[in-house]
């Protein structure tokens, strides 16, 4: 299975990575083209475009100005250890064994506004450029126009390399929109996680994000070969609901936390 996840706004470049093993992003030429567009922006324009504070806008203006493609381990960090946030809390990369980390390298991909598609051990520099950003560029008025079919082609290439035809979409809608679903050369499965609150099961963002990370970890650890094995997912109290599920959208429920 090939697993797709979103990146995170929260980054950790303070703590050293747990391994020196690393790879380089495949789409750095495209990243550099985007950076050139970002370098044209003033901090005031960045604040407006990204809807962030003046402080964060200033930080990212400096990051854009300093970005260069020949980065090395030390100034850069592997994506799976650099991203922090609810999905990555659930995934808990810091506790992966060497074998599990290699499995993640083969079966996990991180969608990115700046880097397109990342392998877990791909080095990245600190950045903020969400996929939904309406950044004017040579190809159009946003990042979806910029990336076009490029990310989808990389997903299809990774799908072939990892050996089967199942794509598990654990990314947010904002990020998965960068993938052209009709051009995918595999079966797409999008799990849904619902928590019970006040007697009703519904998607609660904080819990759902962590659950996506938990399922990504489950896939890396258990290496399920088919959907029957995938729906055996039962971490953190979630269980499969046959009644609410379809083959392309398995639903997992969790009862109200006491």
UniProtKB/Swiss-Prot annotation:
The cross-references to InterPro entries, in alphabetical order and at most eight, read: YaaA
GO BP of this protein: response to hydroperoxide
Q: Which domain of life is it from?
A: Bacteria
Task: Report the leader peptide range.
Answer: none
Gene Ontology terms, cellular component aspect?
A: cytosol
Family in the record: Belongs to the UPF0246 family.
**Name by which UniProt lists this protein:** UPF0246 protein Sden_2729
Species of origin? Shewanella denitrificans (strain OS217 / ATCC BAA-1090 / DSM 15013)
